[in-house]
Amino acid sequence: MAASGKLSTWRLPPLPTIREIIKLLRVQAAKQLSQNFLLDLRLTDKIVRKAGNLTNAYVYEVGPGPGGITRSILNADVAELLVVEKDTRFVPGLQMLSDAAPGKLRIVHGDVLTFKVEKAFSESLKRPWEDDPPDVHIIGNLPFSVSTPLIIKWLENISCRDGPFVYGRTQMTLTFQKEVAERLAANTGSKQRSRLSVMAQYLCNVRHIFTIPGRAFVPKPEVDVGVVHFTPLIQPKIEQPFKLVEKVVQNVFQFRRKYCHRGLRMLFPEAQRLESTGRLLELADVDPTLRPCQPSISHFKSLCDVYRKMCDEDPQLFAYNFREELKQRKSKNEEKEEDDAEN
């Protein structure tokens, strides 16, 4: 672990404020990239503090923008900070920070959705999964447009222990729209409980740490922002392939106002739907009249375990997609109507 019980002694030299840099570079937030800048360094410092002790740690910051959180990370006396920024307009401002912190800041122009962070840091940082988390952290003020696909991608990486998690149980401290943050951390039975809740919590200890009011950002978003901390679990609560778990969970939550059996039926072709759904629920010992927000992680584990056995018995079952079946049926009906019209 990074050294503890020791105050950071390294600090950035005096620099223009983030607001001054934005004016200097004549940069405006790009709406198409869902950009919102956090200029208050008291808040960026708080995000970094909540990430844990970063002294001598290696940090991967996603979407640094004008560099507010970047400054706070550097002031935490990290060993190295890697930033990946898609928008080239921010590179000069980040380069100014790099010049002020020689050897500490590495800037990559790229897309966080495709960047291979598993090759970014030294092999010596890797730790066995069962050990304490490595001295590698992910921190970021995520653009709203990429936050959900990115966390799903990283959750799959956790399941496979690849990507940023080749180093071990890499911790993440990330921002989301408040509503998404609440869903990620929602307890069983709460109104916020969702697909994201289950997918995140079967793999991680998830904490919604604090909320930042929208007025703290420039431009001000229409929503508040939640800061969420993730620590991957040593043992996932569901030990099945990620895609299988995702399919079961998605089906349960696709009809939020119905009983859970309504969504689970869509796992099976129409000809065997009722029988197979009944068998799945009976073997998993799950009440078919639970609402989607009510099943616990252990319920989902049972459903996934039984569904896996059913897929093993019928190798074509996992590939089944009820929307494709509907599409084919609609196409056949249209062809029949055309034939009838011709006759």
From Swiss-Prot:
Transmembrane segments: none
Catalytic activity: adenosine(N)/adenosine(N+1) in rRNA + 4 S-adenosyl-L-methionine = N(6)-dimethyladenosine(N)/N(6)-dimethyladenosine(N+1) in rRNA + 4 S-adenosyl-L-homocysteine + 4 H(+)
Interval spanned by the transit peptide: 1-27
One Gene Ontology cellular component annotation held by this UniProt entry: mitochondrial matrix
GO BP: any one term: transcription initiation at mitochondrial promoter
Subcellular localization: Mitochondrion
Residues the entry annotates as binding S-adenosyl-L-methionine: L38, G63, E85, K86, D111, V112, N141
NCBIfam families with a match to the protein in the record: ksgA
Subunit relationships: Interacts with mitochondrial RNA polymerase POLRMT. Interacts with TFAM. Bound to the maturing mtSSU until the late stages of assembly.
Function according to Swiss-Prot or TrEMBL: S-adenosyl-L-methionine-dependent methyltransferase which specifically dimethylates mitochondrial 12S rRNA at the conserved stem loop. Also required for basal transcription of mitochondrial DNA, probably via its interaction with POLRMT and TFAM. Stimulates transcription independently of the methyltransferase activity.
This protein's name: Dimethyladenosine transferase 1, mitochondrial
Species assigned in the record: Pongo abelii (Sumatran orangutan)
Gene for this chain: TFB1M
